Amino acid sequence: MNHFKTYMLLAGLTALFMGAGFLIGGATGMMIALVFALAMNAFSYWNADKIVLRTYGAVEVDESHPEPLIRNYVIDTVEMARSAGLPRPRITVIDSAQPNAFATGRDPDHAAVAASTGLLQLLTREEIRGVMAHELAHVKNRDTLVMTVTATIAGAISALANFAFFFGGSRDEEGNGGGLGGMIGAILIAILAPIAAMLVQMAISRAREYEADRIGAQIAGDSESLARALQKIEAYARGGYENVQAERNPATAHMFIINPLAGKGADNLFSTHPATHNRVEALMRLGVERGARRPVMAATTSSSVPLSGERGGPWS
């Protein structure tokens, strides 16, 4: 049923894209939008991981890396992937002070995971394991394809809505709704389509985040470390550390373990992620059910040693 709902929501995104095409070019524009949407989905299927990793400047790493933090990150991720019955994913690092992580790829055989330098510097080894187990859960559940295709279509809807705003009223009366009516429709689609696309993203992403938290805790064998990690990441992400690439590509925000957007404007009203405290509570309940002690509240400072070898942090 969860997969059925996801496919229905993806169909809704495609319908929104076609609606924007109709306002721009009538029936012809709608058909062109449909063909374009299908082409985007096919392109995303084969190139999703490459596009996202290139966008964020991800660098592939392995066990031979000279930095101990990165070596441990690779070793633990490979070990957990093996224990979860997954092929070895491409393991990458992105140069960002904001602590965060994501997974991408069309299937487990073509999956990639990424952790930011900020995350590796902030968290303990056990907490990093918890985060990467969450990302491996997305791979195991085959969420990565849906999440990347959703990002592609949602981003295209926003771009097409802006195009509709400027050109939607230029058709004549015989061209299916030109003039004032077409302009009003174009204005409405420019305002409402990105919001609708974001709401669909939220519906897809939120349910999958809870499930990835649950499966991730099983993969890591530890719900407490993931709960602490989420608390730390949330605190630091809201402490003034912007993810520049995510701000430029907001349609990819739902791919991260914590919303990477700064919360300016409407971002804080239309979050693509469940509230972190709700996720932590769910993990706490899971820990109690598994016989673990309840996760303690994370400290707002870290004793981890950054990649530079010097201690530091947002408030140091």
Curated annotation (Swiss-Prot):
GO terms for molecular function: metalloendopeptidase activity; zinc ion binding. CDD domains: M48B_HtpX_like. Binds 1 zinc ion per subunit. Keywords: Cell inner membrane, Cell membrane, Hydrolase, Membrane, Metal-binding, Metalloprotease, Protease, Transmembrane, Transmembrane helix, Zinc. It is found in: Cell inner membrane. Residues 295-316 are annotated as: Disordered. One of its GO terms (cellular component) is plasma membrane. One of its GO terms (biological process) is proteolysis. InterPro entries: HtpX_protease, Pept_M48_protease_HtpX, Peptidase_M48. It is a multi-pass membrane protein. PANTHER family: PROTEASE HTPX. This is Protease HtpX homolog.
